[in-house]
Every structure is written in C-alpha cells, then in structure tokens.
C-alpha cells in the first residue's frame, strides 16, 4: 500500500524526515500577489526577494488558494491519501481540496482519502504533518492513522508573534495609526489560533524579550508541560534561540524543532515574526 501526505503551503515543511517509495509528500502552492507581481509559493520561490518586493510596494497584497485541479493532480498515484490545509477561515484552500477529493473518488472509488482542516497554519501544521509521517511509518491501517491524527490534533496548538504589521495595514485589517505605533514603540503582537481556526490577539509586548515571556505565559495557560514544539520563523533565528532556551530551562526533555516559514507564512507573519506549534 502506498501513501501520500498532501498539504498546501500553509505548511512550512518542504519534505518529510524519511521519504520513500511507499510514502510521498506533496505541497500544493498558494500564489501571492504584490501589485502586479505574482509569486508562486513552491520550492523555487525566493522568499527574501518576495519580502523585499512587498516592503517596497505601497499597494495592497493578496493571496490566492490553489485550484481543485492542482489538488487533484497532487492526490493521484497513491492508495492512501491524507490531505491537510491551512485553516478554512482564512483561505479557500480547504474548499478547493474538498472539491478535488470528490473528483478523485469519482475517478477512483477504491482510493482512501481523508481531508483535515488544520484550523491553523505554520508550526502547528508542521507538527501535524510530522506526526502523520510517524504514524504511517508505524505501519498502521488507514483507519487507525485517521483516528490517531484526529485525536492528536486535539492536543496541538498554535501561538504567533508578529514584529511587523505592514501587510495588515495595507490590506485594511489594522489602521495606519496602530501600525505606526507598533513600529515606533517596538511592540510585538502575541496571538493564537482559536479552536474554530480564527486568529486572536492575546497580548501586546514591548520588545522581543517581553514577547518571549508573554509567549511562555500563554502556552502554559493552554496546558503546555514540555511537549513537542515546532517554531517556524521569518528571518528571526534569535527569537527561536530565546524561546528554546526558556522552554528547555523549564522542561529539559522538550523536543524543539525550528525552520523557516513558507512564502505564505512569511507573507503574513512578516520579518521577525513566528508561528509556533506545540503539544499540550
């Protein structure tokens, strides 16, 4: 039996830890538009160049979800397919993935396919994909993998820290005044993904050190006691070090992984931001 894990580019991972003929990973890219320029969030995207273009532009920026056909092409070729998308509250990606699932089953009624709305993005999606890989490599049945990943999702959370909000201001989601205040006062916005998949602001912290303290406080409120952590950062390895050191000082056995944000997550987290997934 062959397996495939399919995500959109709300997931930061570019590959699995151990890919094989029996287990493959496919990431279906969203597209990002800055003025008249289009950036496809695939392995060839120069994220630093995209971010430079974004900061040089005064025009509104947008993201577009993959088409059902793009998902359908990614689904084909395996007996068992597990699909995970960025939260359906922020993107039409989940709906495209659902339409493609229906088309696949019309083509091949014998394929096993399960679709997951991550209700999240970035680091939490990354944790979920890594757990999927682990479960599949255990040799579990399709039904058991679905059962266990559904239970695991109840134990994962997302917290984020934003150091810049230029994009939110350009797109009218924050006022220009608030954006200027955040920039001038070195404010960091700390928030989370709710259990409904919406993004909620938790705290405003002045400076990175206080933002790290706020993050630790908030994950402990959620029930964090040393579970796995995945930190996806946008050009800010320093904050990853600070968070890792703090977590390790409190929970020495915690397993912490870090990586760069995808184009999509960089687009919204902006320079200096992060999206951290963790287990409770």
Swiss-Prot record:
Keywords: Lipid-binding. GO terms for molecular function: lipid binding. Transmembrane segments: none annotated. Residues 3-280 form the DegV domain. Pfam families: DegV (PF02645). The keyword Transferase does not apply. Hexadecanoate binds at residues 63, 91. May bind long-chain fatty acids, such as palmitate, and may play a role in lipid transport or fatty acid metabolism. PANTHER family: DEGV DOMAIN-CONTAINING PROTEIN DR_1986-RELATED, FATTY ACID-BINDING PROTEIN TM_1468. NCBIfam families: DegV. This is DegV domain-containing protein spyM18_1709.
